[in-house]
């Protein structure tokens, strides 16, 4: 009787292990998602840097929360939490006369990609400091680059 339960337990454990084990295709998919996230962050940074001095100086007055450490995909939760304020600042800078389509599209892409990359795990961000929009985007770009280079080596 115990033998059947033990075998069932072993079979269930093996099934769980094989279904959660990373595969080369999931690694490739993660790599592609990180590349997309990096590209979208760079597009936003380029847009910020293209603003005229008066708009840029106004944008630099807004501060964004940056976590103490950003080393794992779960830390993308912290980026996700700052996406709405980021979008609002970018929309303010664009003004009422221009279309915020590119900004909205980039933010939406970032949100979708972050949700895929971080998974369903909920993570409590420990914020360390506030930074300008340029520093914020640069740090997240650096994070993506470090994860990409670590996974490709």
Curated annotation (Swiss-Prot):
Region forming the signal peptide: 1-20
UniProt GO cellular component terms: extracellular space
Gene3D superfamilies: 1.20.1250.10
Coiled coil start-end: none
Single Gene Ontology MF annotation: interleukin-2 receptor binding
Compartments (UniProt record): Secreted
Glycosylation sites recorded in the entry for this protein: 23, 111
InterPro entries found in the cross-reference section: 4_helix_cytokine-like_core, IL-2, IL-2_CS
PROSITE patterns attached to this UniProt entry: INTERLEUKIN_2
Family: Belongs to the IL-2 family.
Protein name in the entry: Interleukin-2
The encoding gene: IL2
């Amino acid at each position: 009787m115990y033998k059947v339960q033990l075998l069932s337990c072993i079979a269930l454990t093996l099934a769980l292990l094989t279904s959660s084990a990373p595969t080369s295709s999931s690694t490739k998919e993660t790599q592609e998602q990180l590349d997309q996230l990096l590209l979208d962050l760079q597009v936003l940074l380029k847009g910020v840097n293209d603003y005229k001095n008066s708009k840029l100086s106004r944008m630099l007055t807004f501060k964004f929360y940056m976590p103490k450490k950003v080393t794992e995909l779960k830390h993308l939760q912290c980026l996700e939490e700052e996406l709405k304020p980021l979008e609002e600042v970018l929309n303010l800078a664009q003004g009422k006369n221009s279309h915020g389509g590119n900004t909205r599209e980039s933010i939406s892409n970032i949100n979708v990609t972050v949700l895929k990359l971080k998974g369903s795990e909920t993570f409590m961000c420990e914020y360390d400091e506030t930074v300008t929009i340029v520093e914020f985007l640069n740090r997240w770009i650096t994070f993506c680059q470090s994860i990409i280079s670590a996974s490709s080596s």
